[in-house]
Amino acid sequence: MKKMLFTLTSAALLCAAAAAMAEAPVATGETAWLRGKPVATYTCEGKTVIPVSALSEYGFEVENGDALKITVSDAEITAEGAPATAGDKLAEVKAETTATLDGQPVVAYTLEDGDAVIALDDCFAYNAEKLSGIDLIVIGTSDLEKSKDFFVSHMELNVVAEGTLDAASVKALYGQEGEAKYVMVMNNVNSTKLMLIEFSEKTGKTTREGFHAWDYGYFDVAWRCNDIDAMYEELTGAGYSFECEPFSYTTSWSGNAVAECVAYGPDGVPTTMILKTTQEFDTKFYNMVDAVLVVDDMASAVDWYTNVMGMDLVYDAPVEKGLVDRVLGIEGTDITVRMGYFYGSYANGQSTLIEILDYSEPGVSMTEQGGSVPGNGGIFAQAFETKDLDKLLARCEAYGYKTASERTTMTLESVGEIDTVLVSGVNGTLYQFYQAK
């Protein structure tokens, strides 16, 4: 995780000799997420602001002087709320201040007690654009019809698009030769689609082949299931294998009594099925619960998902040892796991949740080792729509993340004409960003 969160440079705090203002910042009683950290919010001069001094309580180091600098420390990131009672007041505003944030002008106010507050909107403006959520989970397949049959016949997903990418587009974005056929499937709940893609050039390998559960990259996709035992019988009868048979437990993170199992779909794609004790639907499956990514540590995930993609870390805690070891692939070991969740803006609808797993055992990047890449069977990318691809790529570059493909224009059925590129994100894992033309 980068040490510098943001800096009010030497041009900072050039006071605008404004007349003293009587209004004091008033607590809203609400918590905001600023680059993965919860902070109490206040209203001041019609703006939502955060107090500079409060940041030190959440892992920030604050230096006051002719230049106000705020950096993030190595303090453990948690999802505990920031304390603030609605209606509480800070000291009165002394003057409006002109400051710079990442080289851009922002609104700040100095207070009578020497503290300062910064407009939250300005802080987010120089954060990343808050991306909505996962639009596409891109899954390589050795047999498109077999993969399509699995998700349509067994999981009752709907085909919403079918098409072929020309050889030039495939070469530019994926680095593969020849055309590629694809099918997009989704349920009636989530806005996230699965994009099943079969390249003309195939390796015969799968993305997770030869790797451990704790190696970095895409882990699985989890679904809420109506009858796990019935699905276990159905899929084993169809020739599919399981990482673990159905078992029951009570989650330590939500308190729900559930049953769970993990099936290996076409090309070995792990498909987790979760059954709550009370159901609210009659179909085989309901929503796509989450898409899981393994990282080297939670700070790396925050650096990518929050600092670059603008998303909020809303949960971060250890998983009770032994509770779901068989699902996590660590049964019989002393390996422990930390789990986190990220939310986007969900402007595109109910996008699936992003779940992060941080194992105590060091791993390797499946992408950098040639596993989770185009041409192999399995999940190799997630795609996110952005309103400004240029700005997003500049932010990736600023945080040390490089493009992993040519930038190209293509048309995807159900999506439209897009400007798109692959980026090597956290631990080298591939992400596809695109902007509608």
Regions found by a protein language model. Name each.
Residues 2-8, 21-125:
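Primary recognition of N-terminal secretory signal peptides and signal-anchoring hydrophobic helices
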Residues 9-16:
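Bacterial N-terminal signal peptides
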Residues 49-59, 145-158, 231-237, 297-313, ...:
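Amphipathic alpha-helical segments
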Residues 57, 74-80, 125, 192, ...:
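Short, charged/polar, Gly/Pro-enriched secondary-structure boundary elements
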Residues 65-75, 162-169, 318-321:
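Acidic helix-start/capping segments at beta-turn-to-alpha-helix junctions
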Residues 115, 124-130, 162, 222-223, ...:
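Vicinal oxygen chelate
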Residues 128-141, 145-154, 158-198, 212, ...:
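An N-terminus-focused feature that recognizes amino-terminal "leader" regions
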Residues 305, 355-408:
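Intrinsically disordered, low-complexity segments enriched in Gly and acidic/Ser/Thr residues
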